[in-house]
Amino acid sequence: MGKTLKSRLVAYQANGSKLGLLPEPTSYTVSFTHDAVGALTVSYSRKALRGEILDRRLETGLEIAVEVSDGGRWIEPYNGRFVIASRSRNALDVSDTVSLTGVSYGWLLKKALNLDTSRLETKGDEKGTRKFANANAGTIMRTFMDENWNRGGVKVDCSRFTSGADSAGKQWGYMLPSIYYDLGISIQDVLDSLVNNGLCDWRTD
C-alpha cells in the first residue's frame, strides 16, 4: 500500500524562533522550485486556531515553512521556507480571513547588492563595473555574500560553500576568464546568470 504525503504550515519570526503551527488554513498553494524562487499563497481565518499569529505586522517579519510527512517525522524540505511579502483581507468578511503571499527564502538575495565602489574598474570600456578574473561561481558568490554580511546587509547564511568547493564538498569546475558586474546589481541576479550559464545550482534548506 502506497504512502500518502501530508503537509502542514509552521510560522516563524523573521530568521528566528518558531511561532507555532497554523493547523486550520482555508487553503494554500505552494511551489518548491529548484534554481529559482518559489511561491506560497495562504488563506487563513484569524478566528481559527492560532490565527492570532497572523496579527503580526509584516514589518516585524513573518516566515511560513511548509513541512511534509509520509507518516514518519515532519520535515521542512529544501526550498520550503517562505518570507511573507504581502497580506490582504476583505473588511466585510466576518470570518476575518487574510490572504498571504510569500516568496521562498532565496528571494532575500534580491535585497543584497553589489555596493563596493572601491573595487570598480577605473578605465576602459568596463569603467565603473566590478571585474572578476579567473574566478569560479563559488568565488564570485562567496565574495559578494561576505561583503553583504560584513556591512550588515541581508542575513542569508551561505556558509556551506567556499571559493574552493560547493556545499557537497565538490571542487568547483569551470573558471571564468573574466566577467563584469554593474554597481548595484543584486546577488540574486548574479546567481541567476551563473545558473543560466550552467556554472552552479542552488537551493535553500
Over which residues does each language-model region extend?
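Short conserved beta-strand and strand-loop elements enriched in small hydrophobics
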Residues: 60-73
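Short, solvent-exposed secondary-structure boundary motifs
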Residues: 14-23, 71-76, 190-195
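Charged- and aromatic-enriched interaction segments used to assemble
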Residues: 97, 103-205
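Short beta-strand and beta-hairpin "edge-sheet" elements
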Residues: 70-102, 203-205
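Surface-exposed or flexible loop/turn and strand-edge residues in extracellular/cell-surface modules
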Residues: 37-39, 79, 176
